[in-house]
């Protein structure tokens, strides 16, 4: 059985790591903004002290400013904690802000995998369509 005081301190620490106050830990999800819900979910994952963090569409539903803030937060945590982050995203700005390596899935197959800059130059209709004219901006 874990000590209640230890759990409270852990919750406060992990909330602080994602930019939230201890009071946010007492609120129900409906009382939080979309960005705060994402941050609470991230704090919950960090409570387990992971080496690998799995994120599924981490910025979905966030406005561009909150999305950028979340990308910066995950990037900071990745560097500070030495995390490996595996992420599913369709958001090019999230990909540009966090990814070093990319796997592109199409037709139930991995059609490209490697460093971000290399994958963006793959001559495949899906890859060129997905990255489109934004290729240069994303590198």
Where in this protein do the model-derived segments appear?
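Catalytic Walker B motif of ABC-type/P-loop ATPase nucleotide-binding domains
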Residues: 53-56
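Conserved ABC ATPase "signature" region
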Residues: 6-23
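H-loop/switch region of ABC-family ATPase nucleotide-binding domains
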Residues: 89-90
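Conserved catalytic motifs of ABC-family nucleotide-binding domains
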Residues: 49
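Conserved ABC ATPase signature
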Residues: 28-32, 36
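A short, surface-exposed alpha-helical micro-motif characterized by mixed small hydrophobic
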Residues: 95-97
């Amino acid at each position: 059985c874990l000590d209640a005081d230890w759990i409270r301190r852990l919750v406060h620490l992990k909330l602080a790591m994602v930019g939230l106050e201890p009071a946010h830990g007492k609120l129900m999800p409906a009382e939080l903004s979309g960005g705060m819900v994402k941050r609470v979910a991230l704090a919950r994952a960090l409570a387990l002290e992971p080496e690998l963090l799995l994120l599924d569409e981490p910025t979905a539903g966030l406005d561009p400013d909150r999305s950028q803030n979340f990308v910066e937060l995950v990037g900071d945590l990745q560097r500070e904690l030495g995390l490996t982050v595996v992420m599913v995203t369709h958001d090019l700005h999230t990909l540009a802000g966090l990814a070093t390596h990319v796997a592109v899935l199409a037709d139930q197959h991995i059609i490209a995998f490697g460093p971000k800059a290399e994958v963006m130059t793959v001559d495949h209709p899906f890859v060129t369509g997905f990255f489109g004219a934004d290729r240069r901006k994303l590198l």
